[in-house]
C-alpha cells in the first residue's frame, strides 16, 4: 500500500513539474527557438506564452550547418490583410486578398502599409497587421 501511494505521488510530482516547469514569458523575452541542423528541425522552448502564441520571428542566425530562428509571443492584431508579393508597390486596397478586422464599434483599421505595426511574408503573400484607431 505504501509503495502504491509513493508511486502515485511520484507520478503526480512528475506531472506537476512537467506542466509548470516553464515560466510565463515577458513580452520582450524569446519564447522559443526553431533550430534546423542538417535538415533536422528541433524546438528549444525557453518560456511559456500566456496567450495563444503567434509565430513572430525576431532573429535568424545561420552558420554552415545550422539555422536558428527565434520567436517571441505575440497576440494577433485585430486587423490583418494579405497582398500578393509581386503587387506590394501597388495600392493595398486594389491587391488585398483578404481583410479580417474585428475593431470595436466606432473604430476603424488603418489600411495602408505605412501604418502596419508588423508585416510577415509567407509563401507569395505578405500579411500586414494593424491596430484599430
UniProtKB/Swiss-Prot annotation:
Domain of life of the source: Eukaryota
Protein name as it appears in the record: U-scoloptoxin(11)-Sm1a
GO cellular component, one term: extracellular region
Entry's family note: Belongs to the scoloptoxin-11 family.
Primary location class: secreted
GO terms assigned for molecular function: toxin activity
Tissue specificity note: Expressed by the venom gland.
Keyword annotations: Disulfide bond, Secreted, Signal, Toxin
Gene source species: Scolopendra morsitans
PTM field: Contains 10 disulfide bonds.
Signal peptide location: 1-19
Subcellular location: Secreted
